[in-house]
């Protein structure tokens, strides 16, 4: 089978909930990163075999949002596109599918990634289709129902984090310390310009005057301390330890990579940023969905023939501090190699885009450090994990 390589990788800066990107639909965010991939490589858009993008909150987004993004990006109408939903793992599963297509010879060039605008997720009214003859009607928040609610146990994702905190004996103090460190690392990375090369600026229309460029993650909070986080009330259980401060946030953004067969990249004279060494998915108990990266990581490492100790860098999505700490405890990885520029607790978690966002951040940090082996992994609502390893030979 053919080696699959990444020749370009980019993301938008992550917008806060109801923040700078709130009015820009997910397909437009996706289109922006696709255009940037083509600009960076000089690739003729007609050479793209398919576009595969994750998006979780598709209600009200129109037919096949990935197709919308592809057309808006200027790809020819003959280039097909697919939207996939694997909840938080969608953006990374898109790379799995793209790599599979290339490895088996079905494609040579794939755009893969994810897009999400949580700010625009609509409220829906169940039952209205068949008529509301009398009485009150109920509005359902599609963002919570389709993105943040466990369909098996009928509770919020935050309860799954509480379950892990209880199972692993994780204290509120440990979780707050983890969250504060994530914020501090992210602020240091932003101030040091470490995200600059991976971010595609977005032009945000204004009511008056020219559009404003948006190129800096706006979720991280400078000056966050453990003491400040300790003042927050539990968000999901009265006697719980998971708060808004030690959990990821609601966000908007997009990310994408350009995948090619190694032979195609060589023929086009494009430099290879990294090779996809392996990828894997796994299922776990939905009640402790956050532990999903453990089995997914072990499977991916086994496929690559690597040990955990060989990894130079790891990007593990921080859905919750409790979840991240539980995964770290199970795998026993070196925390100094994990999310070195902060994670989703600070940077944000636009759910359909996050899988590719962590991959893009991993890749650019590997380039910056000349790292050879890296891992991207995420937990997934409903009880799954997803992982992918990168090699820079």
From Swiss-Prot:
CDD domains: thiolase (cd00751)
Pathway(s) the chain acts in: Metabolic intermediate biosynthesis; (R)-mevalonate biosynthesis; (R)-mevalonate from acetyl-CoA: step 1/3
GO BP terms, alphabetized: fatty acid metabolic process
Single GO MF descriptor: acetyl-CoA C-acetyltransferase activity
Active site residues per record: 88, 349, 379
Subcellular location field: Cytoplasm
Principal location listed in the UniProt entry: cytoplasm
Residue intervals passing through the bilayer: none
Keyword Lipid metabolism: yes
Pfam family, one: Thiolase_C
EC number: 2.3.1.9
Family indicated by similarity: Belongs to the thiolase-like superfamily. Thiolase family.
Protein name as annotated: Acetyl-CoA acetyltransferase
Organism of origin: Pseudomonas aeruginosa (strain ATCC 15692 / DSM 22644 / CIP 104116 / JCM 14847 / LMG 12228 / 1C / PRS 101 / PAO1)
